[in-house]
Amino acid sequence: MSDRYEIVLTCPKGLEGLLLEEARALGLEEAREQTAAVRGQAELEVAYRLCLWSRLANRVLLVLSRFSMNNAEELYEGVKAVDWRDHLEPAGSLAVEFSGHGSGIDNSHFGALKVKDAIVDRLRTAGGERPSIDKINPDLRVHLRLDRGEAVLSLDLSGHSLHQRGYRLQQGAAPLKENLAAAVLIRAGWPRIAAEGGALADPMCGVGTFLIEAALMAADVAPNLKRERWGFSNWLGHVPAIWKKLHAEAEQRAAAGLARPPLWIRGYEADPRLIQPGRNNVERAGLSDWVKIYQGELGSFEPRPDQNQKGLVISNPPYGERLGDEASLLYLYQNLGERLRQACLGWEAAVFTGAPELGKRMGLRSHKQYSFWNGALACKLLLIKVQTEQFVTGERRTRTEDEPVAEASSQARLSEGGQMFANRLQKNLKQLGKWARREGVECYRLYDADMPEYALAVDLYRDWVHVQEYAAPRSVDPDKAQARLLDALAAIPQALGVAQSRVAIKRRERQTGTKQYQRQAAQGQFMEVSEGGVKLLVNLTDYLDTGLFLDHRPLRLRIQREAAGKRFLNLFCYTATATVHAAKGGARSTTSVDLSKTYLDWARRNLSLNGFSDKHRLEQGDVMAWLAEDRGEYDLIFIDPPTFSNSKRMEGVFDVQRDHVELLDLAMARLAGGGVLYFSNNFRKFQLDESLVARYQVEEISAQTLDPDFARNPKIHRAWRFTAR
């Protein structure tokens, strides 16, 4: 047999260039790229070294023969022409893998059968002994690739794919193969950074694949050092002495590398279910001194190496089915960019994504991009130097083509009533604007039917205006009511200096049946606002309510102040804005319950927007039924029920006046010792049942829960503080 072989290394598509460099460095000669492969010449020692040291290859194939074929019979004869007695005992086991088609072979299973038949027929003894088939752990794994009439017949020296290092026995929902992770690290410059003593952090590490591959590189550990069974283990051409020498050298290098002071390599994962599997993987890889994995939210990611060294932040954010809808992903990418800008100045960053358009939302400019394939999914690796000159932040607002210039420059003359309304808006803006700026309030009620003939609520949401028209009583002439509304709408842009396109108008009236949940429109326009250090989503167009009850702002801020270390329960949670405040305040856990899937999806996006994960429970269900079955204990409870609620998903109708005693008794049964329950509602005729005051310590705090923008309308809601007697 020849001492020199043709070797083919297979790899994921997109890794060919990197694999070519690696293979040459490991001794492959005459190496050249092919699609998803590298081909070259090597002696057996180099082939073994490629098996042991390649971080990028899937398989190491030793080519036995190349031959032309036009039909199945020529395939059979070409395979049978190889002297298989040099490779396998007649009593040995065999597996055949066949790829490609053509020349009369249009079915890979049929092609594999012809290859198997040829080998078996060549090795069958006079006594009838012949190789058996073992698809799992054969003595010899044979590979035949058919490409445009040429058959390439090879032995698979690797056995199982080389990406299976043996440490990742537990994985998350969207695993990244080890050799692809290694390729991403190499492209990101990790070998250079590691050689300089740099750090590495992954804010969404899953079960730690990036971390482990990075540590293996930094510690000079052969990626397949711990593999016990190889494709060549029972091959008759195997030379154990050569393999033992190479394996011993690799063990010595690993021992020396692991004996060095470990680099700072840390991973953070929000999902508590992945922490122990990740740590188990690290332990199996023998890297417990090098790699540490902690539970941590993206929103609090801040790498702090022990010697203040900089390094590489690497991440494979979710980009498809594993983490919900595109909106949540958008906020996750925005949050990642925010954490990089705020906590990682001077670092390098590498973001591997199957959704490059989301990568553009991070507010950071990438200096280099590489194309990869993760299976069948085209991906990009974005390389970023986290320096201020690479930041893409701040609002850049220009007039759109369909927005007339006149909207900003020309003002129509107002009617007398319209001018009075405008004057009132400007007066309120002057008074409330000072308060809002001082308190950092972005969204507040500017006007609330201050002038009875203009029965509107006008709310400011940053540079948008949300207008709710209260339905006029039947005694008012509809034409006059319509005229006043038009006067007011004409006055609002002029008085407040906003474009008409940024005024959203709705009619508010008593909601009946399921109408309370129905969409008013379907524009799907969400905007982000800030309140008390958290970010919240509002929708000014699609629903009657915007997703943020402005009158409850003081209660939400109170909850944030009181939430540290507490178990928080939010009933009738709506879009869970109070839950976001509780999470921001350091709540140990949060549970939010609502009947509406729409609002719970909104709640999930609010949490995602702030970097909070699914550890914050969102429960869809009828609150009364849920409370009756729940056995949890909570330190802080917030209940803000609707006046009434009616849905196909619940039994009967909820009426706050009729049902509040049962509701509060159920909730107080879940309150831990020393806990506090806040109860509020907007029913203006509501009367708290006196029996509750007898059973519990009850304090009305309505006046304390009104900010200046609602002080002129003290009946907007009532609120109580409940504790156990």
From Swiss-Prot:
It catalyses: guanosine(2445) in 23S rRNA + S-adenosyl-L-methionine = N(2)-methylguanosine(2445) in 23S rRNA + S-adenosyl-L-homocysteine + H(+); guanosine(2069) in 23S rRNA + S-adenosyl-L-methionine = N(2)-methylguanosine(2069) in 23S rRNA + S-adenosyl-L-homocysteine + H(+). The keyword Cytoplasm applies. Pfam families: Methyltrans_SAM (PF10672), RlmL_1st (PF22020), THUMP (PF02926), UPF0020 (PF01170). It comes from the Bacteria. The keyword Transcription does not apply. Its main location: cytoplasm. CDD domains: AdoMet_MTases (cd02440), THUMP_AdoMetMT (cd11715). Residues 46-157 form the THUMP domain. InterPro entries: 23SrRNA_methyltr_KL, DNA_methylase_N6_adenine_CS, RlmKL-like_Mtase, RlmL_1st, SAM-dep_methyl-trfase, SAM-dependent_MTases_sf, THUMP_dom. Gene3D superfamilies: 3.30.2130.30, RNA methyltransferase domain (HRMD) like, Vaccinia Virus protein VP39. It is found in: Cytoplasm. Specifically methylates the guanine in position 2445 (m2G2445) and the guanine in position 2069 (m7G2069) of 23S rRNA. Belongs to the methyltransferase superfamily. RlmKL family. This is Ribosomal RNA large subunit methyltransferase K/L. It comes from Ectopseudomonas mendocina (strain ymp).
